[in-house]
A protein has these predicted regions:
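Conserved N-terminal catalytic core of the sugar/cofactor nucleotidyltransferase
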Residues: 34-99, 178-180
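Conserved alpha/beta core of the MobA/IspD/sugar-nucleotide pyrophosphorylase nucleotidyltransferase superfamily
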Residues: 158-228
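Short, conserved active-site loop motifs that form the nucleotide-linked donor/cofactor pocket
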Residues: 3, 73-75, 156
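Conserved beta-loop-beta/alpha segment of the NTase-like Rossmann-fold superfamily
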Residues: 75, 81-143, 160
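N-terminal glycine-rich phosphate-binding loop and ensuing alpha1 helix
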Residues: 1-58
Length: 228
């Protein structure tokens, strides 16, 4: 069994307010995506990394691969219009076999703890898949500027990445989505649509996705604390 990590890195990063996509901006001396990739480079359970990116950033990623000795990166493929398209392009380019695991992780989640990654891989090896989530702690409402109803937070999770699936299951789910003109916000939605049960694994509050300027400031503070 081989474990292949797919990192879709084609987001525009418009909500962060940055001029360039946030994953290519330097924070604490390294591009954001390097912080993310090093988590996978350093984890012994990960065998290979495939990146999907906009064509005009592929050269930069090749440079970063060499500069930071990211030796597990086997391919850098062109991404698509949607995140789903980028993941699918990377998945099709892989040489994964039926018993191999495919990890999908957001490029803009650089603070993924090693124990969360390792635990999710182990769960996927045992149960066939793993979806990293954190339990909701806040009171949750449904509505549009006016409260319509309250959700039971004991039954609600915030979905994160990594999301891990057996290669043939994820490929089947992707093909099904395209056959039905469906675009999902993550891979677990696609896998559930083909009848698979998805296993929840505990995530971390530090594994947040950097989307806004406030997230960038939070990342800097947490990363600096880790270096102390």
């Amino acid at each position: 069994m081989k474990t292949v990590a797919i990192i879709p890195a084609g987001g525009k990063g418009a909500r962060s307010g940055a001029a360039a996509p946030k994953q290519y901006i330097k924070f604490l001396g390294k591009e954001l995506i390097v912080h993310t990739l090093e988590v996978f480079q350093q984890n012994k359970a990960v065998d290979e990394i495939i990146l999907a990116a906009e064509s005009n950033y592929i050269g930069l990623l090749e440079k970063l691969k060499n500069e930071y000795k990211l030796t597990k990166i086997s391919k850098i493929v062109e991404g698509g219009e949607e995140r789903q398209d980028s993941v699918y392009n990377a998945l099709k380019s892989s040489e994964a076999k039926a018993d191999d695991l495919v990890i999908v992780h957001d490029a803009a989640r650089p603070l993924l703890p090693q124990h969360v990654l390792t635990n999710s891989i182990e769960t996927a090896k045992q149960k066939g898949n793993a979806l990293v989530c954190i339990k909701a702690k806040d009171t949750l409402i449904k509505g549009s500027r006016v409260v319509e109803s309250y959700l039971d937070r004991d039954e609600v999770y915030y979905v994160q990445t990594p999301q891990i699936f057996l290669y043939p299951v994820l490929m089947k789910a992707m093909k099904n989505a395209y056959e039905n003109n469906f675009i999902g916000t993550d891979e677990s939605i696609l896998v559930r649509r083909v009848g698979e049960k998805v296993n929840i694994v505990d995530g971390s509050v530090f594994n947040f996705k950097i989307t806004t300027a406030e997230d960038i400031e939070m990342f800097k503070r947490v990363a600096l604390r880790k270096e102390e």
